[in-house]
Amino acid sequence: VDIAKLDKKQLRDYRRQMQIIFQDPFSSLNPRMTAGDIVGEPLMVHDIAHGERQKEMVAELFERVGLRSGQLTSLPHQFSGGQRQRIGIARALALNPKLIVGDEPVSALDVSIQAQVINLLMDLQNELGLSYLFIAHDLAVVEHISHRVAVMYLGRIVEMTDKTSLFDMPLHPYTEALLYAVPIPKSGARTRTRKIVEGDVPSPINPPSGCHFHTRCPYA
C-alpha cells in the first residue's frame, strides 16, 4: 500500500494498524501530559474508548508493559529512561496494531535496561502475535530479537535473509565487513583474516549507479 496516495480517512484507518516506538524515550513523550493521558490519547483520537473505559484500558496496558496503575497520573520526568520507553510501548499497543516499527528503541538506554525492554518486546510478540520492523545498528540486539534481517547501505537493501544464515554465512561483502567489525573478547577466537571496508562513504544524495557499494567493494 502506498500510504502517500491515501486520503485522510483512509490514512486514519490505516494508522490504527501501524504504530511506532521512537528512539529517544526522553523527547518522544509530551512533558505536559500525564503518563495515563499519553497512553490513552490514541484511544480517544480513534474513538475507541472514553471516560472510565479508557482509564481501565490504559491501566491494563500499563500492567502489560510492567508499569503500575498507580503511575498513571505521573508526569514523564518522574520516570526512568526504561520506564519512559515502556510508556512508549504501551502507547504503541493501545490500538492493537498489526505492525510496530521500532526506530532503534533501545539504543538510548543502558545495556541492562536494553535487555529488559528487548525481552518485553519479544514476550509481547509471542503473546499478541505482533510483527516488528526493528531498526537497529547493534548486531547483538539484531541477532537476539530478529527472525529475518535486512542489511542496508546508503538507503538500499543489499542483503536480506533469515537470521541464522546472515550471521553464519553472510553473502554480501558489506555484511561480511559489518560482522567482522564486531570485537570478540576471546584470544584466538577469530582465525580468518579480518575484512576491512576501504574508501569513503559516497554521498547519499548522489549515490553510485548500480550497486551502491561497488566503489568500496573488494570484488568489484
Residue ranges, per PLM feature:
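Hydrophobic anchor residue at the start of the ABC signature
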Residues: 89, 113, 117
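Conserved ABC ATPase "signature" region
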Residues: 2, 53-70, 176-180
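A short, proline-enriched helix->beta-strand linker immediately N-terminal to the Walker B motif
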Residues: 94-98
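Charged, flexible cofactor/metal-binding loops and thiol motifs
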Residues: 69, 162-220
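Conserved ABC ATPase signature
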Residues: 75-79, 83
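ABC ATPase NBD coupling module
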Residues: 2-19, 45, 165-170, 202-208
